[in-house]
């Protein structure tokens, strides 16, 4: 990251650039348990009723059990995952300031890349007994009567590439005026283009017909002392693949055309704003009133399939929104401010959800109801009108007590559901992102921070705290009989920090809490989960050695709080790995050094 700034008289020019690269390269050992809920393996359609089996039901769900003689299949997976993410960003900002006019421009560009490959070999086994306990109040456990792979083998390679870039140009101007309460007029325009594309490939390779003994010298058992799970299988994946099916062969990779898509978004906008300063009821008042016009056009290219027939497809959407806004700030005195704000806002749909490309049943083959799935290039943005009111009391240096309340009247939301559509004259049930109806989001937020100036010799110590409460009637579309609350809205969140600061040295220990909330944990927005409440403790130490050189040490999750997610809006239904599941991240430590030229 770097910044270059040049100034001459009233003109200022600044360039900043950023490049970052993160690589994840890890061996992954996994056991996949197939059919715990319902199995058809070896003709066994209900493993819970076999002789010797037992189970526990809570709220209609099987949450624990011992399955005997059920012949369930366990996949022993030896895998490797590599992911390289990079970000390149740059901006050129120019500003000229005169006595009356101020002119500015901003040219920016950024590009994010992600290349990831998951590669694996799989063995199988059919243990006589599988025992598990996934109840919400306990650490999940699962064990088998035998942990040894019994047969094999299959291989899988799944590369994926994602590209996301945006370029934008903004021009703005302001003019000082003396027209009653108005002090300045501001206006400007911005154009931007964003483009996102995805590519995915897949290879499945079958193993030779040979006994498990052919791999005995290449695999070994791995136990996880901190997790109550059955023994995992480790091994030399490349050598296992060579013996099992001749090695991983890149020529076997097939393009997954239905996961190949490209979405472009062009945004043109202009704004005008009047800034004012006056008095009302004997109180100084500042604020502004303005409007922003936004035109958005999206185009999407991809592929559709009807059965096994794949063909190119395109989609487009264009819409224009007028977004007025106004703010009022009542400067009650030197310590107290009352703020009001009202605005109409939009949030454009994620580009991933605007992808074209549908998987549709072939009516010449499918018997019964036709189904399909895919993206939706016709999505409208999330729209809302919001009102904010806050009261701030700055009762001492670096001390604040504040109360803020807000309400958002939502006109249109976005979520995944299954809708009935007529396609080529035929009735389909299509699962895709759709626009939903409106609702409200109400919230209140309390903030309190202060140094301990009122305690002798404790003025370098202080506290920061924040608590927010959210209420909303907005729901996701699934599960249909008990929809999840809108994604990202935690009813309760809180932060409490104790700090110490001398100017050159600062220490902070903090506690953060959130109540359960809905998340999209992975890359597929159709797969919703509910993240259980969490409370974490973090530590941060900062030492500014000189004007140029500084050091920072951070320790996160000192209490080793696990992550637990559940599905279907039922806390006892533990989510699978891709949707959060149960994960122990451990404590994380980070040491940084910064030098300013």
Identify what each model region corresponds to:
Residues 8-10, 19-23, 98, 109-115, ...:
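Transmembrane beta-strands of outer-membrane beta-barrel pores
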Residues 44-72, 131-154, 201-259, 369-374, ...:
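Flexible glycine-rich, low-complexity coil/linker segments exposed to the extracellular/periplasmic environment
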Residues 79, 83-87, 259-265, 346-402, ...:
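Outer-membrane beta-barrel signature, preferentially recognizing the C-terminal barrel domain
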Residues 514-520, 542-597:
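C-terminal beta-signal and adjacent terminal beta-strands/loops
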Residues 405-410, 417-421, 426-520:
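Gram-negative outer-membrane beta-barrel transporters
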Residues 195-197, 222, 232-235, 239-243, ...:
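Surface-exposed extracellular loop regions of Gram-negative outer-membrane beta-barrel proteins
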Residues 9-10, 95, 100-104, 176-185, ...:
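Short loop/turn motifs that connect adjacent beta-strands in outer-membrane beta-barrel proteins
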């Amino acid at each position: 990251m770097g910044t270059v700034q040049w100034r001459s008289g009233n003109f200022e020019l600044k360039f900043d650039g950023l490049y970052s690269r993160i690589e994840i390269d890890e061996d992954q050992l996994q056991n996949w348990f197939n059919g715990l809920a319902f199995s058809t393996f070896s003709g066994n359609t209900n493993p819970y009723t076999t002789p010797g089996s037992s189970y526990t039901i809570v709220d209609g769900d099987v949450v624990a059990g011992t399955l005997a003689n059920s012949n369930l299949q366990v996949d022993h997976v030896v895998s490797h995952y590599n992911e390289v993410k990079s970000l390149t960003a740059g901006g050129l900002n120019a500003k000229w300031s005169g006595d009356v006019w101020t002119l500015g421009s901003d040219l920016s560009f950024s590009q994010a890349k992600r290349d990831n490959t998951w590669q694996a070999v799989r063995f199988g086994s059919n243990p006589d007994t599988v025992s598990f306990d996934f109840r919400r109040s306990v650490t999940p456990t699962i064990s088998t009567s035998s942990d040894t792979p019994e047969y094999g083998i299959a291989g899988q390679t799944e590369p994926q590439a994602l590209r996301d870039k945006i370029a934008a140009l903004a021009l703005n101007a302001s003019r000082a005026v003396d027209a009653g309460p108005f002090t300045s007029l501001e206006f400007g325009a911005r154009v931007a283009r964003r483009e996102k594309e995805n590519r995915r490939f897949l290879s499945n390779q079958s193993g030779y017909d040979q006994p498990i003994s052919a791999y005995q010298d290449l695999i070994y058992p791995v136990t996880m002392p901190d997790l109550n799970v059955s023994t995992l299988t480790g091994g030399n994946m490349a050598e296992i693949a060579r013996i099992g099916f001749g090695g991983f062969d890149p020529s076997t990779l097939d393009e997954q055309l239905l996961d190949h898509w490209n979405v472009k978004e062009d945004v043109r906008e202009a704004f005008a704003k009047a800034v004012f300063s006056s008095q009302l009821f004997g109180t100084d008042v500042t604020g502004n009133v303005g409007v922003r016009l936004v035109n958005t056009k999206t185009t999407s290219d991809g592929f559709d399939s009807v059965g096994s027939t794949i063909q190119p497809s395109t989609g487009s959407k264009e819409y224009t929104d007028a977004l007025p806004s106004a703010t009022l700030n009542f400067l009650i005195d030197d310590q107290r401010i009352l703020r009001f704000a009202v605005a109409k806002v939009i949030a454009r749909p994620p580009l991933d959800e605007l992808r074209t490309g549908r998987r549709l049943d072939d009516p010449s083959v499918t018997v019964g109801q036709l189904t399909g799935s895919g993206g939706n290039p016709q999505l409208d943005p999330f729209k809302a009108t919001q009102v904010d009111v806050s009261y701030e009391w700055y009762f001492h240096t670096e001390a604040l007590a504040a109360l803020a309340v807000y309400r958002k009247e939502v006109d249109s939301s976005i979520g995944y559901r299954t809708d009935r559509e007529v396609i080529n004259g035929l009735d389909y049930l299509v699962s895709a992102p759709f626009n939903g109806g409106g609702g409200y989001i109400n919230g209140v937020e309390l903030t309190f921070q202060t140094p301990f100036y009122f305690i002798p010799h404790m003025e370098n110590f202080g506290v920061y705290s924040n608590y927010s409460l959210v209420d909303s009637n907005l729901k996701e579309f699934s599960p249909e009989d008990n929809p999840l609350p809108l994604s990202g809205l935690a009813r309760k969140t809180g932060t409490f920090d104790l700090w110490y600061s001398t100017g050159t040295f600062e220490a902070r220990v903090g506690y953060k809490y959130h109540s359960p909330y809905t998340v999209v944990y992975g890359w597929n927005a159709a797969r919703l989960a509910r993240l259980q409440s969490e409370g974490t403790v973090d530590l941060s130490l900062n030492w500014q050695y000189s004007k140029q050189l500084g050091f920072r040490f951070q320790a996160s999750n000192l209490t080793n709080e696990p992550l637990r997610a559940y599905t279907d809006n039922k806390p006892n239904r533990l989510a699978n790995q891709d949707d959060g599941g149960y994960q122990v991240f451990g404590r994380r430590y980070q040491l940084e050094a910064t030098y300013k030229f």
